[in-house]
């Protein structure tokens, strides 16, 4: 993911088992990455971002009203930061998280899905788009 670009992934949210998840994955190294998406945790879909730079943290907010709808996760890389935004259907993007990131780093990006507590999770991805970075960080 070059600097001054944005990546979006859109998928239908149909998660119903603990830790089902999908979204966007940005990788610098095995111990330095960002995972942004929706994870089914504690009985409800949670919009969240995990940031790992040797240690990890997770920010999350419940979005039960997103179940069964199209979710878009957007990562915009500009200057020394990545801005994570998300939306459901055609609603406006909402700011989720601002993550510092050295502009000299090479970043690989891709969609992801994960179901660590079961087999057989299927996620319907609708689009993968690269555009210009957002004008504002937040």
Predicted feature descriptions by range:
Residues 1-47:
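Secretory/extracellular carbohydrate-interaction modules
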Residues 69-83, 88-90:
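Localized edge beta-strand/strand-to-loop motifs within extracellular or lumenal beta-rich domains
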Residues 32-34, 57-59, 91-97:
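Surface-exposed loop/edge segments in extracytoplasmic proteins
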Residues 10-12, 25, 74-76, 85, ...:
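Residue-level recognition of well-ordered beta-strand positions that form the cores
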Residues 51-74:
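Short, aromatic/His-centered strand-loop micro-motif at the edge of beta-sheets
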Residues 101-138:
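Ligand-recognition surfaces built from glycine- and aromatic
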Residues 87-108:
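Short, solvent-exposed beta-strand-to-loop segments that form ligand-recognition rims
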Residues 1-7, 62-69, 103:
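Extracellular/lumenal carbohydrate-interaction signature centered on repeated Trp-anchored short motifs
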């Amino acid at each position: 993911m070059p600097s001054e670009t944005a990546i979006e992934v859109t998928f239908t949210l149909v998660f119903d088992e603990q830790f089902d998840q999908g979204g966007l994955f940005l990788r610098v190294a095995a111990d330095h990455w960002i995972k942004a998406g929706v994870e089914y945790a504690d009985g409800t879909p949670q919009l969240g971002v995990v940031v790992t730079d040797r240690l990890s943290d997770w920010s999350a907010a419940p979005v039960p009203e997103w179940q069964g709808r199209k979710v878009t996760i957007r990562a915009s890389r500009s200057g020394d930061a990545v801005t994570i935004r998300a939306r459901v259907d055609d609603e406006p993007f909402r700011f989720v998280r601002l993550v510092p990131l050295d502009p000299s780093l090479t970043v690989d990006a891709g969609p992801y899905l994960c179901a660590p507590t079961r087999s057989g999770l299927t996620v319907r991805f609708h689009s993968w788009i690269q555009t210009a970075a957002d004008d504002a960080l937040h």
